[in-house]
Amino acid sequence: IHEANAKPGLANRLGGTFAKFTGVAFPNTPFPRATLVGMPMKDEIAYLNREAHRSKARRNLGLDPQKPTVIVTGGSLGALSLNNAVAACRDHFAEWDFQILHITGKGKAVLDENGELLSAPNYRQIEFSNGMQDVYAAADLLLVRSGAATVSEVAAVGVPAIFVPLPIGNGEQALNARSLVEASAALLVKDAEVTGEWFAREIPALMANPEELERMGAAAYELGIRDAARVMAEAVLKAAEK
């Protein structure tokens, strides 16, 4: 069994009683007899050299390859609070010395008051990206949900991030981010606090402090686990032999 979330689901809790091997993605997962293995991910992400890939990644995403970049994404389904917060800052975009890539989610394009695709200087929106390695390489700062895969990939590649846990469910997204947040390797903000005012205040302030971004990224990288796919594959093969 592999438990992805820091708060195990019922099926895995029951199955873990009989499993020959249980791997968990996060160190704070309350699972008896579990082994910390991390989250299996593609090698393109696990072993990504962000600095070497940065300029190409930004070009792939339609961005200025030389400009500092904030990327906002709620995943493939989007996140209404993140989308609304970004849209509310439209009048500020031209003032900032960084660009924003806004990944809105499939079918969640952000429109202006005329029903046209929201457009502004230093701003680009797309509905989704098939290459998350480009997203991680291009970003100087991520504003994202804290699903298990996202948190694990953020740590593996060492990208500074602000996590906004999904406000519904059983609280697993906040728990997923806990180890990074407690290590000062990432920030966590409640969904209800993410407004246009918050974005306009906090994002430019953090982007103006590249030393802090570098420190966050390095701290995240130290906590990253990059060989989970291999470890889980070996565990499955070993269990099958018994």
Task: List where the protein language model places each region.
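C-terminal alpha-helical cap of glycosyltransferases
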Residues: 225-242
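Conserved donor-binding/catalytic loop of nucleotide-activated donor transferases
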Residues: 137-139, 155-164, 183
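Donor-nucleotide binding loops and adjacent catalytic segments primarily
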Residues: 53-59, 63-144, 174-178, 189-199
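C-terminal "capping" alpha-helix adjacent to the active site of nucleotide-linked donor transferases
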Residues: 184, 189-190, 194-211
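Active-site-proximal region of nucleotide-activated glycan assembly enzymes
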Residues: 1-55, 60
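Short alpha-helical segment that forms part of, or immediately flanks, the ligand-binding pocket
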Residues: 133, 151-159, 178
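A short, well-ordered alpha-helix in the C-terminal region of glycosyltransferases
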Residues: 205, 212-226
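Short hydrophobic beta-strand element within catalytic cores of glycosyltransferases
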Residues: 144, 160-170
